[in-house]
Each structure stands twice: as structure tokens, then as C-alpha cells.
């Protein structure tokens, strides 16, 4: 959910009045398309935490706090990455790369969003969810962006942990604790992130090379990259099946069928590279979004329907 995340808002505002262009630039800083992952995973996590019997107001408040936290992390990421965003074609139209927003104002905006996220979640949910939001922002900015991203090809493996946190925040907002289903959901997204991101990086590896970012497709052969994509895809699917122990039959069936489909795409990509055939990594990137959405939507439906879990059958 990363491609073209900032170009849409700014593109629509090119002929807008200056005030509106400024608003759109600040919206673009938050990378709205990246925030979609929050919506796709947080609601199902909250529904599973209480088997569908969750106060709708709590869901809305948690989503608002989560959106502010994600927007804060993404904005501060833009501040830290402004130099390489100017080099990469895919990110050259981001607000700081185009000087649509000053670095100082972007930094203030990101910090205010982060403080607001913590305060809102503490006030409307509980302290644990607020602290998890702060930890997510800090990890994404200081560990992933400032340390891992420019130093190791495993950047998205460990840095991807930040994208797993919305399920933890959602679960803790309902239960005020962290239990094993939340950890399994964390694992699903953790293992899903590398194949999702590496598929995109295969398409834009020259961009990353020019910016000096050692993404795996930049420093490794296509065969090695697609092999690791396949390994992490298997780990993703196995994690979704493990989650079936806490969910019901609807989720189990959908997770299995979606997993077969996702694995087929990953195997096809790996096989294509080994046979020297033309490959379409961007297709896997796009379809991985659909896969995650299908699995978590099935989890939400299962939780609301309230059919017996596999433990109860």
C-alpha cells in the first residue's frame, strides 16, 4: 500500500488555490494510502478481541488515534527521507522533495500528530494503547528510517514491525492487554511485509540504487529475492492458518483459499525467474494488498457472525 501514496493528493491540487494546495501537501505528508493498512487490520483485530461485541464508539476513537499515530510516523519519515525522496522518481513529488512544506513545519506537524495520538488513545481507550502508539512512531522513525533503511538489506524485515502494530493497538484498546491472537496477527503482517515490499522494490530497484538505499533487490540476484519472497509468503500463510485456532470456520476457509492463491503467485514469480521468463513483480505487490484485505475482512465477518471457533468444534 505504498505506491503513489502521495502523488494523488498533490496531483489533484496543482490548479487549486494556494491555501488548498497547502492543505493537500500536509495530507500528502501523512501518506494516506499507507494508512489504509491501519483500517484493514485494526477493525478485525478489535472485533476478534471481543467476538464482535465491541462498542462502535471505541472502534471509531481507536481508529482516529491510530490514524494520527500513523500520520505522525509517516510525516516524520518524510522529514528524515527528504534527501533521498528528491533522487527517486517514485517519491520526487512528495511535499518536502518539492519544497511545498518546510522541514520545520513538517517536523512540528508530525510531533503534534504523535502527541495527539497518544493523548487521544489514553483518553478514549486506555494507557496501553497510547503507549503502543508512541512506541510504533519511535520505532518507525528512529529504528527503521534513521538506522535500518540505509544500512541493511534486511531493513523492511525488521523495520516492518512498525506496520504490525495497529493490530496490537486495536486489541489492547479492547482488552487492555496483549494476548496470543494479537501476537499471531502481528506475525501475519510481519511475514507479509517483506514479499509485499520486495516485489515493489524489484520494480523500482534502480530508484533505490540511485538513492543509495540497499533494498534486497538492489544487492541480490532476482533468484535470491524471489526465493526469499516465496519463503516469507509461506510463513505468512502458515501464520494466517494458525490464527484460525482463535477464529471460526468462515475465517479458516477463506484464509486457506486465499493462502493457496497467494502462494501460487509467489511460486509463479520464483519459477519465472528460474526459467528466465518475463516476470511481473508489481502484480504480486498489488495482489498482496488484496490478499491481506481478504484475510482480515474474513476475520471481521467471522467475529461478527459468531460461529464457533476451531477450539469449540
From Swiss-Prot:
Superkingdom per UniProt: Bacteria
Keywords for the protein's UniProt record, in alphabetical order: Cell membrane, Heme biosynthesis, Membrane, Transferase, Transmembrane, Transmembrane helix
UniProt xrefs under InterPro entries: Protohaem_IX_farnesylTrfase (IPR006369), UbiA_prenyltransferase (IPR000537), UbiA_sf (IPR044878)
GO-annotated molecular function: protoheme IX farnesyltransferase activity
Disulfide bonds: none
Membrane topology reported for the UniProt record: Multi-pass membrane protein
Listed pathway(s): Porphyrin-containing compound metabolism; heme O biosynthesis; heme O from protoheme: step 1/1
Any GO BP annotation: heme O biosynthetic process
Transmembrane segments: 23-43, 56-76, 107-127, 128-148, 155-175, 182-202, 243-263, 291-311
Primary subcellular site in the record, as a coarse category: membrane
Reaction(s) the record says it catalyses: heme b + (2E,6E)-farnesyl diphosphate + H2O = Fe(II)-heme o + diphosphate
Enzyme Commission code: 2.5.1.141
GO cellular component: plasma membrane
CDD domains per record: PT_UbiA_Cox10
Coiled-coil ranges per UniProt: none
Gene3D superfamilies: UbiA prenyltransferase
Subcellular location: Cell membrane
HAMAP family on file: CyoE_CtaB
Other information: Carbon 2 of the heme B porphyrin ring is defined according to the Fischer nomenclature.
Function: Converts heme B (protoheme IX) to heme O by substitution of the vinyl group on carbon 2 of heme B porphyrin ring with a hydroxyethyl farnesyl side group.
Family: Belongs to the UbiA prenyltransferase family. Protoheme IX farnesyltransferase subfamily.
Name of protein: Protoheme IX farnesyltransferase
Gene this protein is translated from: ctaB
